[in-house]
Amino acid sequence: MKRYILFLLALLLFAFSSTAAAGESVNAAVAANFMQPFKEIAKSFESQNSVSVVATFASSGHLTGQIMNGAPYDIFLSADEERPAALSQKGLAEKPFVYARGRVVLWTAKKELCRVSGWQEVVKHPSVKKIAVASPKVAPYGAAAMVALEQNRLRDTLQQKFVYPENIAQAFQYALTESTDVSFCALSSALSEQGKKGCYFEVGEAPPIVQGGCVLMRAKDREAVKKFVNFLNSPEVNSIKNKYGYK
């Protein structure tokens, strides 16, 4: 009988612990360009708090569509300010905040292209047959790259060479695997360990990317989400963001 009672107590304790742990989580929708720093940030946050962080990485436009269709995210970290603001105006999110500022660069794994001077000369180089640009309709970094191309009157002349992956992380992977010769990508990708396998060129004409986030109204564990949002602006996280070229 004593063993049976102890068993029941252990079972109840396990059930209580499991229930508590299940509620201590943050479900984040994160723009693909921020994937590398976010993984480090989440790992550090989890090590300091009894909260698990689950992330989905995709283009900002794709994630916005999921949120509007009822996806159970707690927080949205976009690659622009417009989408979080739109969600807030629709009553789906709290007031937006800025969590990072990023830049577009041109990246290549091809050593011969690394010797060329300037991104404009690289994309016009005879050996460049395919150029990865994240879909401008759903990826803010792709839209910014198009601004730079248009300013240099290169968009129309290079149109046949463009390949449009859905998000900026995929665009980088295309060039990394040499499925394309070059890629317009986030500086964070160029500064990653994989990015060091090639070289990158500054694209000064591309507007800076101001990245906004928001806490969604359907967030379940609001206390955990609040902790995470505060953590995003901590000196430790700022150091991680700076390492990947964000301000």
Predicted features along the sequence, with ranges:
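N-terminal hydrophobic alpha-helix used for membrane targeting or insertion
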Residues: 6-7, 63
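Bacterial N-terminal signal peptides
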Residues: 7-16
